[in-house]
Amino acid sequence: MARMNRPAPVEVSYKHMRFLITHNPTNATLSTFIEDLKKYGATTVVRVCEVTYDKTPLEKDGITVVDWPFDDGAPPPGKVVEDWLSLVKAKFCEAPGSCVAVHCVAGLGRAPVLVALALIESGMKYEDAIQFIRQKRRGAINSKQLTYLEKYRPKQRLRFKDPHTHKTRCCVM
Protein backbone atom coordinates (compact mmCIF):
# COMPACT_ATOMS: atom_id res chain seq x y z
CA MET A 1 0.00 0.00 0.00
CA ALA A 2 1.42 3.41 -0.97
CA ARG A 3 2.05 5.72 1.93
CA MET A 4 0.82 9.30 1.67
CA ASN A 5 3.57 11.88 1.83
CA ARG A 6 2.67 13.81 4.97
CA PRO A 7 4.86 16.21 6.90
CA ALA A 8 6.44 14.77 10.02
CA PRO A 9 5.07 15.92 13.37
CA VAL A 10 6.82 19.02 14.70
CA GLU A 11 7.39 20.05 18.28
CA VAL A 12 6.92 23.70 19.23
CA SER A 13 8.32 24.58 22.67
CA TYR A 14 8.02 27.91 24.47
CA LYS A 15 8.12 28.80 28.18
CA HIS A 16 7.65 25.23 29.40
CA MET A 17 4.81 24.65 26.95
CA ARG A 18 5.31 21.86 24.43
CA PHE A 19 3.01 21.31 21.48
CA LEU A 20 3.13 18.61 18.85
CA ILE A 21 1.59 19.76 15.55
CA THR A 22 0.70 16.88 13.27
CA HIS A 23 -1.61 15.75 10.48
CA ASN A 24 -4.58 13.49 11.10
CA PRO A 25 -4.02 9.76 11.23
CA THR A 26 -6.36 7.12 9.86
CA ASN A 27 -7.18 3.80 11.48
CA ALA A 28 -4.51 2.29 9.21
CA THR A 29 -1.79 4.70 10.45
CA LEU A 30 -2.96 4.92 14.06
CA SER A 31 -0.22 2.73 15.53
CA THR A 32 2.50 5.01 14.07
CA PHE A 33 0.59 8.05 15.35
CA ILE A 34 0.46 6.58 18.87
CA GLU A 35 4.20 5.83 18.71
CA ASP A 36 4.86 9.48 17.79
CA LEU A 37 2.68 10.69 20.67
CA LYS A 38 4.54 8.46 23.11
CA LYS A 39 7.93 9.55 21.74
CA TYR A 40 7.06 13.18 22.55
CA GLY A 41 5.24 12.34 25.78
CA ALA A 42 1.89 13.72 24.60
CA THR A 43 -0.98 12.61 26.82
CA THR A 44 -3.62 14.91 25.31
CA VAL A 45 -4.63 15.15 21.64
CA VAL A 46 -6.81 17.99 20.38
CA ARG A 47 -8.56 17.01 17.14
CA VAL A 48 -9.81 20.09 15.24
CA CYS A 49 -10.94 18.30 12.07
CA GLU A 50 -13.63 15.76 11.34
CA VAL A 51 -13.13 12.30 12.81
CA THR A 52 -10.88 10.08 10.67
CA TYR A 53 -9.94 7.44 13.25
CA ASP A 54 -11.22 5.59 16.29
CA LYS A 55 -9.90 7.21 19.47
CA THR A 56 -10.37 4.05 21.59
CA PRO A 57 -6.78 2.74 21.02
CA LEU A 58 -5.38 6.10 22.18
CA GLU A 59 -7.56 6.10 25.29
CA LYS A 60 -6.41 2.54 26.07
CA ASP A 61 -2.84 3.93 26.02
CA GLY A 62 -3.80 6.70 28.48
CA ILE A 63 -4.06 9.44 25.84
CA THR A 64 -7.06 11.78 26.08
CA VAL A 65 -8.62 12.88 22.78
CA VAL A 66 -10.59 16.14 22.73
CA ASP A 67 -12.78 17.00 19.72
CA TRP A 68 -13.15 20.67 18.79
CA PRO A 69 -13.67 20.61 15.00
CA PHE A 70 -13.96 23.82 13.01
CA ASP A 71 -13.95 24.67 9.31
CA ASP A 72 -10.82 24.08 7.25
CA GLY A 73 -9.01 27.30 6.36
CA ALA A 74 -11.03 29.31 8.86
CA PRO A 75 -10.08 30.90 12.16
CA PRO A 76 -11.36 29.09 15.25
CA PRO A 77 -14.74 30.03 16.76
CA GLY A 78 -14.66 31.83 20.12
CA LYS A 79 -15.78 28.74 22.05
CA VAL A 80 -12.90 26.68 20.61
CA VAL A 81 -10.44 29.46 21.55
CA GLU A 82 -11.79 29.60 25.13
CA ASP A 83 -11.74 25.82 25.53
CA TRP A 84 -8.24 25.56 24.00
CA LEU A 85 -6.73 28.23 26.22
CA SER A 86 -8.39 26.73 29.31
CA LEU A 87 -6.94 23.32 28.45
CA VAL A 88 -3.47 24.77 27.79
CA LYS A 89 -3.47 26.73 31.04
CA ALA A 90 -4.65 23.75 33.10
CA LYS A 91 -2.27 21.31 31.41
CA PHE A 92 0.90 23.39 31.67
CA CYS A 93 0.21 24.82 35.13
CA GLU A 94 -0.39 21.27 36.35
CA ALA A 95 2.56 19.74 34.49
CA PRO A 96 5.02 22.30 33.05
CA GLY A 97 7.00 20.79 30.19
CA SER A 98 4.35 18.23 29.31
CA CYS A 99 3.20 17.94 25.69
CA VAL A 100 -0.18 18.62 24.05
CA ALA A 101 -0.66 17.29 20.52
CA VAL A 102 -3.00 19.12 18.16
CA HIS A 103 -3.94 18.10 14.65
CA CYS A 104 -6.10 19.06 11.72
CA VAL A 105 -6.02 17.30 8.34
CA ALA A 106 -2.56 18.37 7.12
CA GLY A 107 -1.26 20.13 10.24
CA LEU A 108 -0.85 23.39 8.31
CA GLY A 109 -3.87 25.54 9.22
CA ARG A 110 -6.16 24.92 12.15
CA ALA A 111 -3.62 23.21 14.43
CA PRO A 112 -0.86 25.84 13.99
CA VAL A 113 -3.40 28.65 14.59
CA LEU A 114 -4.28 27.21 17.99
CA VAL A 115 -0.61 26.88 18.90
CA ALA A 116 -0.05 30.49 17.76
CA LEU A 117 -2.88 31.64 20.04
CA ALA A 118 -1.23 29.94 23.02
CA LEU A 119 2.09 31.62 22.20
CA ILE A 120 0.39 35.01 21.83
CA GLU A 121 -1.53 34.60 25.10
CA SER A 122 1.72 33.82 26.90
CA GLY A 123 3.32 37.06 25.73
CA MET A 124 4.72 36.51 22.23
CA LYS A 125 3.89 39.05 19.49
CA TYR A 126 1.68 37.60 16.76
CA GLU A 127 4.36 38.11 14.07
CA ASP A 128 6.91 36.28 16.18
CA ALA A 129 4.46 33.45 16.91
CA ILE A 130 3.80 32.94 13.19
CA GLN A 131 7.50 33.03 12.32
CA PHE A 132 8.31 30.69 15.22
CA ILE A 133 5.79 28.12 13.97
CA ARG A 134 6.67 28.51 10.28
CA GLN A 135 10.35 27.86 11.01
CA LYS A 136 9.28 24.37 12.02
CA ARG A 137 6.17 23.91 9.85
CA ARG A 138 6.70 25.48 6.42
CA GLY A 139 3.50 26.70 4.81
CA ALA A 140 1.60 26.86 8.08
CA ILE A 141 -1.25 29.37 8.51
CA ASN A 142 -3.14 30.74 5.48
CA SER A 143 -3.90 34.41 4.71
CA LYS A 144 -7.37 34.39 6.34
CA GLN A 145 -5.87 32.88 9.49
CA LEU A 146 -2.99 35.40 9.38
CA THR A 147 -5.51 38.25 9.34
CA TYR A 148 -7.34 36.67 12.28
CA LEU A 149 -4.10 36.41 14.30
CA GLU A 150 -3.14 39.98 13.39
CA LYS A 151 -6.47 41.27 14.72
CA TYR A 152 -6.54 38.95 17.73
CA ARG A 153 -6.22 40.82 21.02
CA PRO A 154 -4.70 38.69 23.77
CA LYS A 155 -6.16 38.85 27.25
CA GLN A 156 -3.02 37.40 28.83
CA ARG A 157 -5.01 34.29 29.80
CA LEU A 158 -1.84 32.26 30.14
CA ARG A 159 -0.54 34.60 32.82
CA PHE A 160 -1.61 34.99 36.43
CA LYS A 161 -0.95 37.21 39.43
CA ASP A 162 1.49 35.84 41.96
CA PRO A 163 -0.38 36.40 45.28
CA HIS A 164 2.89 36.96 47.15
CA THR A 165 4.50 39.56 44.90
CA HIS A 166 1.40 40.89 43.07
CA LYS A 167 3.40 40.66 39.86
CA THR A 168 1.99 39.13 36.71
CA ARG A 169 3.86 36.15 35.41
CA CYS A 170 3.23 33.41 32.93
CA CYS A 171 1.57 30.38 34.47
CA VAL A 172 3.95 28.12 32.61
CA MET A 173 7.26 29.65 33.62
From Swiss-Prot:
Q: Which residues form the active site?
A: D72 (proton donor), C104 (phosphocysteine intermediate)
Q: What would changing C49A do, according to UniProt?
A: No effect on enzymatic activity
Gene Ontology molecular functions: protein tyrosine phosphatase activity
Residue pairs linked by disulfide bridges in the UniProt entry: C49-C104
Q: Which residues carry this modification: Cysteine methyl ester?
A: C170
Q: What does this protein do?
A: Protein tyrosine phosphatase which stimulates progression from G1 into S phase during mitosis. Enhances cell proliferation, cell motility and invasive activity, and promotes cancer metastasis. May be involved in the progression of cardiac hypertrophy by inhibiting intracellular calcium mobilization in response to angiotensin II.
Q: What is this protein called?
A: Protein tyrosine phosphatase type IVA 3
Originating gene? PTP4A3
